[in-house]
Amino acid sequence: MTHYHFVGIKGSGMSSLAQIMHDLGHEVQGSDIENYVFTEVALRNKGIKILPFDANNIKEDMVVIQGNAFASSHEEIVRAHQLKLDVVSYNDFLGQIIDQYTSVAVTGAHGKTSTTGLLSHVMNGDKKTSFLIGDGTGMGLPESDYFAFEACEYRRHFLSYKPDYAIMTNIDFDHPDYFKDINDVFDAFQEMAHNVKKGIIAWGDDEHLRKIEADVPIYYYGFKDSDDIYAQNIQITDKGTAFDVYVDGEFYDHFLSPQYGDHTVLNALAVIAISYLEKLDVTNIKEALETFGGVKRRFNETTIANQVIVDDYAHHPREISATIETARKKYPHKEVVAVFQPHTFSRTQAFLNEFAESLSKADRVFLCEIFGSIRENTGALTIQDLIDKIEGASLINEDSINVLEQFDNAVVLFMGAGDIQKLQNAYLDKLGMKNAF
């Protein structure tokens, strides 16, 4: 048994990885800021100790896992080096873990967390699968055959991994604080493709993914019969979305997903492709798909009277459009009200017009002040620049949250990657519900 200390344990990936090592029988603790972060709930439920940052946390015989947000000058990292302990970055450590399994990386600008959550749930319907999801959820199952994990492209972190398979959901320009342009993003994915050992499953309608070159087969999925695996006869029902799946032009089977929206069918196709390639039992896969309950902060719903309140991590224009589409398809007779908190000044500046276009698909839009990050907490841009581009949009905060009560037959979408949940909870408090998210 090894004693691990995680520097930045409340980070979504770090939290997941700490849980995995705990489940596998190791002694685990970590440190982070004292502010509440939703990822700490799962850590505390497993009895994993969370400490405030302090050099004295670091003891002899520990292995220290260094979170990506923390430099080598951090007091705990400095102490670890003074004690001559092994200090391993999150990416390198995860790369070592996955080599023990048949591994499936899920990467892409959008849809990583939802697809990884679905993949881990569905594969566990037939084979033991350990998993690491970007919503702070992780589980290490002893004697697992497979390992499903989220692989982030930011700062090219995913180049630390050499997975057996990679699901590539899409390539899009994001993280403008690091990537120069879409070509820079493509180059990162192209390099990652050469790390894959068995096969790549990629969305067929993505023009950039169609240009990817690899040393292994690339299987494209989508809605066209020119794709290697595709869905047809899609029907929206009160139980979710039903569809037929074809592989290489031949009917494979009929599936039902409890979710709504084209993007959820695409996620399911990617997962079904992995199951098909690994020859998993299709009956078990179908049953598992029908019971998928979603992942944290991805269209999580609470219903109060005729109002449906949704918590969603959407923080990029394409993700906002997908979330609004899901609301329209699932609740076609309700208004859609978007409450959005932009995340980072650089992203808001880079996609200002795209944010305005995607948010305008809602019936009414409310915007919060821009949420900064550890690396970037100021900027010349203000939220008024975005408000001015959306007809009827207005600023909202905890003092004005009552305005949402007038939409008594609506889906209210709280979207963002910052602390938008504070606003949600303030609204739920006013409605007499606490701690829903």
Curated annotation (Swiss-Prot):
It catalyses: UDP-N-acetyl-alpha-D-muramate + L-alanine + ATP = UDP-N-acetyl-alpha-D-muramoyl-L-alanine + ADP + phosphate + H(+). GO terms for molecular function: ATP binding; UDP-N-acetylmuramate-L-alanine ligase activity. Signal peptide: none annotated. It is an enzyme of class 6 (ligase). The keyword Transport does not apply. Its EC number is 6.3.2.8. HAMAP family: MurC (MF_00046). Belongs to the MurCDEF family. This is UDP-N-acetylmuramate--L-alanine ligase. It comes from Staphylococcus aureus (strain JH9).
